[in-house]
Amino acid sequence: MVWSVDMDDFSGTICGSGVKYPLIGAIREELRGTPRDTVAPGIEPSDIDWETVARSPPALAPEPDVQAERISIQDLLQQTKGASKKPLPALLTPSLPDNLRKPRVFCYFTNWSYKRPGMGQFSPEDIDSNLCTHIVFAFGTIKDNKLAASDDNDVGDAFNDGTYGRIMKHKEVNPDVKVLLAVGGWAFGSKPFRALTENVFRMNGFVYEAIEFLRLHNFDGLDIDWEYPRGADDRASFVSLIKELRLAFEGEHKSSKNPKLLLTAAVPASFEAIASGYDVPELAKYLDYINVMTYDFHGQWEDTVGHNSPLFPLNSASTFQKKLTVDYAAKEWVRQGAPMEKLIIGMPVYGRTFTLADQTKFDIGAAADGGGQAGKYTGEEGFLSYYEICDFLHEDNTTLVWDNEQQVPFAYRGEQWVGFDDERSLRTKVSWVKTEGFGGIMVWSVDLDDFRGYCGTGKYPLLKALTKELEGYMVELKYEGPYETPRGDGSDPVEEKKLCDNDIGQVTFHRDTQDCKMYYVCQGTVEHHKTCPTGLVFNENENVCDWPSAVEECGHLVAT
């Protein structure tokens, strides 16, 4: 509707264009596909009565132009004023192709983190679920060949939610976040998995009991952390376990109509461990995601100083040492047959420490005399959380070094030495992830980031640096496996809930719960994935692109 025609240049003499009704004519030109300059020879545009043209039947509409147009924030805000307050789809970006998806951000946190003293104590409520696509609780356990909680407090009772219930409340904040339970881990070891898989009946019982346990506690999937299968028997057993879990998850999904449970695995970065225990092409068939633990390349178990998670090797490194890097490890999984879009690259938010044998020799490869002093809150020799590293860096006489070859920092003071990741190194790693085309990142573990803002740069500085660097990145989907879907999320495309289901052609708007800057426009049953202009987020209440401060769920994007 136009308010009002008497305010347009109805005579064609005021604005100097010689055209009657230039604004109404522009509206009709955009809506009905009749250009104003398409006139018969010898007829001037000023001779056309655009009021009559505007009332004429519409021309056949051409195919819509999906080319995005750049508009300024001021233009957008001006356009959104008025009665409808709905953004104009023609001004926005085209829909997301089916062969692309957003990167995954797996956020692990541990069940021993809440036992840390003082400001190190971490609770499920401390998680910022808007920074994660998947939350992984580590760890569950195996008791009597069944998946079980590792702590009675995890399950809760009639009087309290327990840890599981408290984690699930994040789905109320971010309905699209997936919550998985991890089982295994370094302390759990390999023996329980061997005992489970050496008997087919025992393994199948575990598989079906696991489904019941996950559904009972509202988990969205299971993360298998077998550290580590070694040898031909373990190699075959691990594939059997993953295959049986996947087949059971698929069958339960089809019979119950519930969303399919996700199946992931945490796997080593060591090329030796990969060769010894992992049939990569077979595992890739059944796993939704493969979380590569690209850290702990060096630590207190060695007698020389080395960095926890170097991206690249030193030029002077030996052939063996050059394989102990993030770059080599991730590409080794690809060489062995893992699809790049399924590989999730580990990002540590902690450091490994050493005690120098000689304070004057502090570079990579210097002699070490065991691990560094235990942290005040984590209490483990040879290990510091990022918020403990902040304390270390602020002590007098501490020297911070950026290793330009390995693309990571380290610091030393006296005989104490720490190699860690900071915002700069993590941004560099994510840039590398994007260049190579991997499927996303996983963080070990969010309870080790500065979740309280103790370091003075806000809460979760490392996790925020990671997610900020991922913005705009899309993962290309190339793998064609037996259980793949166009979106690569492991769900059944036939029974997947459809966002756009209005068969009368109504236009509706919906926020993208995983990305504040994006939203969906439904034209009947046709879905278009759109992006707001730079600096704005989608406001579902008003159906406009708005300032982040006006949208509660997106307040964390407000510039500081």
Predicted features along the sequence, with ranges:
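Glycan-recognition patch characteristic of GH18 chitinases/ENGases
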Residues: 2-30, 76, 85-214, 244, ...
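Glycan-binding loop/region signatures in secreted carbohydrate-active enzymes
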Residues: 10-16, 22-27, 87, 91-101, ...
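Cysteine-rich, disulfide-bonded extracellular modules and peptides in secreted proteins
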Residues: 27-31, 475, 487-560
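Extracellular mucin-like PTS segments
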Residues: 31-94, 483-493
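Conserved, mostly hydrophobic/aromatic
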Residues: 135, 181, 224, 245, ...
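An active-site-proximal structural segment forming one wall of the substrate-binding cleft
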Residues: 200-222, 275-283
